[in-house]
A protein has these predicted regions:
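Glycan-processing catalytic domains of CAZymes
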Residues: 1-184
Length: 184
């Protein structure tokens, strides 16, 4: 998706929004994690989105603060080694997904240095040995989400002044501070 197309879509929002606005991105069927061409497009799309938001912010009429990645697998299960029939090669897929997260975050940070990035589900979903009160409610284990998140964290750590990557904590069974303390 071109920067101009994304900019035009974002510009359809009312000007003068005074509250902080976060742009939600749903990743759906970006391609096999080993497909460099497909993931170059994904990375370019994120970079173009960051550039479009930055340009609109510079007009003074918009207040985009960041990007929220809804990384829940609604259709494609891009974060699951079983989906790629690659359980025996899962470590190499984790390495590739780590690099994909890092590349995306680097592209976004180059275009929008003060962006606030959040993923709705953090790396906990890659821990198949998580507590029963998480696993017991049907939250599946996705081998590759943690690697994607870690790659993004690495890019942030290499960028002076970047905001930390946020774990959106979309965990409907965690309500109290004690619940989160036990989990994390």
């Amino acid at each position: 998706v071109s920067k101009q197309t994304l900019k035009d879509q974002l510009a359809e929002l009312p000007e003068g929004i005074t509250k902080e606005v976060y742009i939600e991105v749903v990743m759906d069927r970006p391609g096999d994690v080993r497909d460099d061409g497909a993931w170059t497009t994904v990375t370019s799309n994120f970079t173009n989105l960051a550039q479009a938001a930055t340009e609109l912010n510079s007009t003074g009429n918009y207040n985009f603060k960041g990007i929220v990645i809804d990384n829940e697998d609604y259709n494609s299960e891009i974060f699951d080694c079983e989906n790629y029939n690659a359980v025996s090669e899962c470590d190499s897929y984790k390495d590739k997904m780590y690099q994909r997260g890092k590349d995306i975050m680097r592209g976004v940070l180059e275009a929008w240095p003060d962006v606030i990035m959040m993923q709705m589900h953090g790396p906990y979903t890659s821990d198949c040995d998580r507590p029963d009160y998480i696993a017991g409610v049907g939250v599946p284990c996705f081998d590759l989400k943690g690697s994607f998140f870690a790659g993004m964290v690495q890019a942030v750590s290499e960028t002076p002044g970047a905001h930390p990557l946020l774990n959106g904590g979309q965990d409907y069974i965690l309500y109290s501070p004690n619940d989160f303390q036990k989990h994390y």
